[in-house]
Amino acid sequence: MTISQPGTISATLGEMTVQLRLSLAALMQIEDALGASGLEALAARFRALTASDLSAVLTALLRAGGHEDADALAQAAAPAEAAQAVLACFEANLK
């Protein structure tokens, strides 16, 4: 996984290379989806992430990365690939 522009990484989901972007809008969507307010609350929620939470986070990052089919891509992703992609995006952007 590589960073191609600020906030964006490339990741592989299945046979497809996708762009995930951690933007302010994506963070807002993630906070809303997880019912968390702020990065500290998000970190706490991430420690007990459900499959629905993971899908919501991946969808927000894919949408911010420019994928119009973000919902379908997130739902089709293998759980391990989805988790790795989300982790890589946050690690690349929140150092």
Predicted region positions:
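Charged interaction scaffolds used for protein-protein
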Residues: 1-17, 28, 32-52, 62-95
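Residue-level signal for threonine
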Residues: 23
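A residue-level signal for conserved active-site and pocket-lining positions in enzyme catalytic cores
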Residues: 58
